[in-house]
Amino acid sequence: MIYGTGIDITDLKRVQRVVERQPRFLTKVLTPNERVDYQKLSGQRALEFIAGRWSAKESYSKAMGTGIGATVTFQDIEIRDNDAGRPVVRRQPFGGIAHVSISHTETVVMTQVILERGNESW
């Protein structure tokens, strides 16, 4: 059963400006494991990565119905790629399954998270 769904669209230039002006942004948004993944990237791909993770975590918080804040923080959610390169929510406060999709164009990133409960044995 679907518990919640969240969608976010983020402008890449906006994220680039934030990263350039606020170096702590990376530490705030990315978990230590995600920062290791980020440091392997450069240029446009690095920007897409940080924007994608930020947007996906925003989508997750919307699916929870809380937004990012006291109930759910960026550090509560960890998204890593599986062996095939698909993003997977590895750590999260929701007790069910979290599905994530991240898509990019040259200028924006769009993410969707669906939280599912009751089919954990699938």
Swiss-Prot record:
**Per the record's keyword annotation, is Repressor included, yes or no?**
no
Q: Which cofactor does it need?
A: Mg(2+)
The family database entries (SUPFAM superfamilies) matched by this protein are listed as: 4'-phosphopantetheinyl transferase (SSF56214)
Q: Where in the cell is it found?
A: Cytoplasm
Q: Which GO terms describe its molecular function?
A: holo-[acyl-carrier-protein] synthase activity; magnesium ion binding
Gene3D superfamilies per record? 4'-phosphopantetheinyl transferase domain (3.90.470.20)
Task: Specify one Pfam family.
Answer: ACPS
Any GO CC annotation of this UniProt entry: cytoplasm
InterPro entries according to UniProt: 4-PPantetheinyl_Trfase_dom, 4-PPantetheinyl_Trfase_dom_sf, ACPS, Ppantetheine-prot_Trfase_dom
What EC number(s) does the entry state? 2.7.8.7
* Leader sequence segment: none
Where Mg(2+) binds, per the record, is at: D8, E58
Alphabetically list the UniProt keywords. Cytoplasm, Fatty acid biosynthesis, Fatty acid metabolism, Lipid biosynthesis, Lipid metabolism, Magnesium, Metal-binding, Transferase
Which reaction(s) does its UniProt entry say it catalyses?
apo-[ACP] + CoA = holo-[ACP] + adenosine 3',5'-bisphosphate + H(+)
Q: Tell me, which GO biological process terms does this entry list?
A: fatty acid biosynthetic process
User: What HAMAP family does this protein's entry cite?
Assistant: AcpS
Entry function: Transfers the 4'-phosphopantetheine moiety from coenzyme A to a Ser of acyl-carrier-protein.
The record's family statement is: Belongs to the P-Pant transferase superfamily. AcpS family.
> What name appears for this protein in its UniProt entry?
Holo-[acyl-carrier-protein] synthase
The protein's organism comes out as Levilactobacillus brevis (strain ATCC 367 / BCRC 12310 / CIP 105137 / JCM 1170 / LMG 11437 / NCIMB 947 / NCTC 947) (Lactobacillus brevis)
